[in-house]
């Protein structure tokens, strides 16, 4: 009985409060659990194919010999544009090799729950007068047309309104520049930056110091000076240190270059604005030409819409799932050893001309004897990692006060770049899954 007493004494007292608390836990256990998020799937770059090049101890012997007059390595936008250029020049035998299973590179798209979405680049700004080749192609595919001497864009493919908004101080505001009091120091600094951008856009010679493509603008000592200092340093020396302005300029650099204002050059930071739509402080109105150039083409699948139209003329001449292993320049030709992922065999291509439309660090690795210029350029270039995540929502997001849902939605202070609603271009009048 002694042991029995000891056991009885060891039992905890069960008060009413403890009973109520434990009952609550039991009832909570009976509540329906939130469904787990569906597992994520990786549909990006086929990294294991690239690792085949990195990890190979020796190159496999070719099982097949193939020939082409022109061989383009890489079917991203650069490779597709190069192939188009050769075709327009009358070269019929243009072949393309692409590591992925679809052309487009950083402009590929995807389908999620039956809805198209981008895997990378998702818009194209209306080209300026210097981008003649881009404008000509957009005319060819019907995105641009000439009316009474003016270039007019097909509004069906322009980003629908509202285009962008920013989340700041607990509410959404129109545009991407945080709203400020026009009489504040923030507004004064924004006007000062706007004036500086305008001066670079309209030099004494009457021409802009910046343009797209950049090589069509003459390089000079002033631009070289901008290129030797960071954008942040250039802003600091001019007293442009307002938190709202600096956040926006930093966001613009991260969005376009993958690096912050304290890393990119002042030339790059100013180029973002001066080569296109400029910078407009609160209360400043854009001119008619600037308003037109602020428009962007976009589609649910992003720039995959464009990539598909660039790739369409090549059809059977576009060889996807081909990993380039080696490029060797001979006296009379160039040989390219590639691994065909579908056939699981190595293939040797021989061409008169080879275009390396590849990232520089890959080009420097696959070329048998890379020239000094390629090695130096690859060593100097830094790459910034980035990730595009597509989420399927059963219904529209619960919205907060302020500006209505837009195509581009950015959060002040976030390390990310915001989110784009791929279904913003939908003509369905009733909001739904996105």
Question: What residue ranges belong to the model's regions?
Answer:
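Mid-domain catalytic core of redox enzymes
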Residues: 320-434
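Glycine-rich FAD pyrophosphate-binding loop
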Residues: 87-110
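Glycine-rich Rossmann-fold phosphate-binding loop(s) that bind the pyrophosphate
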Residues: 74-76
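Extreme N-terminal leader/targeting segments of oxidoreductases
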Residues: 2-69, 88
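N-terminal Rossmann-fold NAD(P) dinucleotide-binding loop
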Residues: 79
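Dinucleotide-binding Rossmann-like beta1-alpha1 core, especially the glycine-rich loop
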Residues: 114-202
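Active-site/ligand-binding neighborhood in enzyme catalytic cores
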Residues: 205-326, 331-333
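Conserved hydrophobic helix-helix packing surfaces used for dimerization/oligomerization
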Residues: 70-72, 94
């Amino acid at each position: 009985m002694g042991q029995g007493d000891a056991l009885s004494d060891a039992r905890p007292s069960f008060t009413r409060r403890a009973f109520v608390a434990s009952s609550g836990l039991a009832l909570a256990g009976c509540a329906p659990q939130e469904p787990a998020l569906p597992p994520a799937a990786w549909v990006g770059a086929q990294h294991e194919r690239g690792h085949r090049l990195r990890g190979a101890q020796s190159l496999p012997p070719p099982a097949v010999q193939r020939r082409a007059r022109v061989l383009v390595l890489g079917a991203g936008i650069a490779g597709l544009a190069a192939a188009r250029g050769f075709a327009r020049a009358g070269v019929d035998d243009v072949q393309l090799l692409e590591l992925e299973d679809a052309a487009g590179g950083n402009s590929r798209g995807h389908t999620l729950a039956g809805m198209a979405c981008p895997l990378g680049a998702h818009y194209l700004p209306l080209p300026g007068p210097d981008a003649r080749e881009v404008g000509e192609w957009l005319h060819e595919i019907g995105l641009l047309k000439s009316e009474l001497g003016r270039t007019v864009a097909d509004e069906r493919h322009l980003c629908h309104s509202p285009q962008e908004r920013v989340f700041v101080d607990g509410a959404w505001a129109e545009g991407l520049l945080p709203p400020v009091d026009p009489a504040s120091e923030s507004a004064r600094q924004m006007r000062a930056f706007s004036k500086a951008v305008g001066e670079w856009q309209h030099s004494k010679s009457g021409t802009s110091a910046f343009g797209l493509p950049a090589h069509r603008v003459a390089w000079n000592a002033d631009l070289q000076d901008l290129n030797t200092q960071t954008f942040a340093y250039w802003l600091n020396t001019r007293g442009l240190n307002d938190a709202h302005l600096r956040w926006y300029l930093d966001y613009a650099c991260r969005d376009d270059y993958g690096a912050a204002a304290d890393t990119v050059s002042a030339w790059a930071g100013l180029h973002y604005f001066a080569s296109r739509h400029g910078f407009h402080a609160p209360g400043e109105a854009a001119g008619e030409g600037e308003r037109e150039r602020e428009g962007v083409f976009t589609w649910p699948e992003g720039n995959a819409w464009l990539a598909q139209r660039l790739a369409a003329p090549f059809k059977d001449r576009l060889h996807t799932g081909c990993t380039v292993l080696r490029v060797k320049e001979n006296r009379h030709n160039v040989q390219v050893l590639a691994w065909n992922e579908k056939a699981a065999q190595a293939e040797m291509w021989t061409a008169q001309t080879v275009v390396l439309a590849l990232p520089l660090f890959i080009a420097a690795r696959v070329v048998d004897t890379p020239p000094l210029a390629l090695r130096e350029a690859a060593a100097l270039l830094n790459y910034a990692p980035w990730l595009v995540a597509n989420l399927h929502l059963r219904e529209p997001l619960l919205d907060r006060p302020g500006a209505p849902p837009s195509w581009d939605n950015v959060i002040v202070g976030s390390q990310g770049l915001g989110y784009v609603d791929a279904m913003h271009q939908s003509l369905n009048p009733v909001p739904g899954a996105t």
